[in-house]
Amino acid sequence: MASPTLTLLLLLTTVSFFISSSADPDMLQDLCVADLPSGIKINGFPCKDAATVTSADFFSQGLAKPGLTNNTFGALVTGANVMTIPGLNTLGVSLSRIDYAPGGLNPPHTHPRATEVVFVLEGTLDVGFLTTANKLISQSLKKGDVFAFPKGLVHFQKNNGDVPASVIAAFNSQLPGTQSLGATLFGSTPPVPDNILAQAFQTSPGTVKHIKSKFQPKK
């Protein structure tokens, strides 16, 4: 029989694992509706006065209609996270709707704070993610299919059909964050030096400047 000390050590190790694997900190009360206008800076958002909480803090119609896809990539992500549903604060979940024009692409990106699971509403998609061993895991999806993207790994979705497509994406974080590789590397403020990118991608500074012109920082 294991000693009490060993049993306690194993228990603490198990508990520590589950705590550390949680995408967001656990909630400590029934609800903590985000007080978004507050100037207080914490890891997350402070709670608004419980007496002022209403059902509107937990409600959104933002995913009901398709998003406009008339942009460079032919895709649009509409978020339903703590920024649009403040009642999600501390709950550790959020959703997005992604709409794709025919041939539209949600370009390679990562979610540093969450795992993502997509459910295909309409259309067909080619999706995939890359492991840290540079292995591509890819799949073709159709209406009703589900696919998971592990937390922090680079992934993408492309509409491979000639009709619009859409998915609902679920995340185990109230605010998963998104880093699009192209915009991050070539459209940052201040910019990453041309010589750094040229050496990293084994190309010329002139080519880097040309690519940067496609990713002008937002003003």
Swiss-Prot record:
Glycosylation site residues: 70
Disulfide bonding pattern of the chain? 32-47
**CC annotations in GO:** apoplast; nucleus; plasmodesma
Q: Which CDD domains match?
A: cupin_OxOx
Query: Which keywords does the record carry?
Result: Apoplast, Disulfide bond, Glycoprotein, Manganese, Metal-binding, Secreted, Signal
- Any one GO biological process: plasmodesmata-mediated intercellular transport
The superkingdom of the source organism is: Eukaryota
Disulfide bond listed as a keyword: yes
Q: Listed GO molecular functions?
A: manganese ion binding
- The residue ranges of the Cupin type-1 domain are 61-209
Does the UniProt entry include the keyword Glycoprotein?
yes
Pfam families hit by this protein: Cupin_1
Q: What coarse category fits the chief subcellular location reported for this protein?
A: secreted
What family does the entry list?
Belongs to the germin family.
Could you tell me what this protein is called? Answer: Germin-like protein subfamily 2 member 1
The record lists the lineage as: Eukaryota, Viridiplantae, Streptophyta, Embryophyta, Tracheophyta
Gene name? GLP4
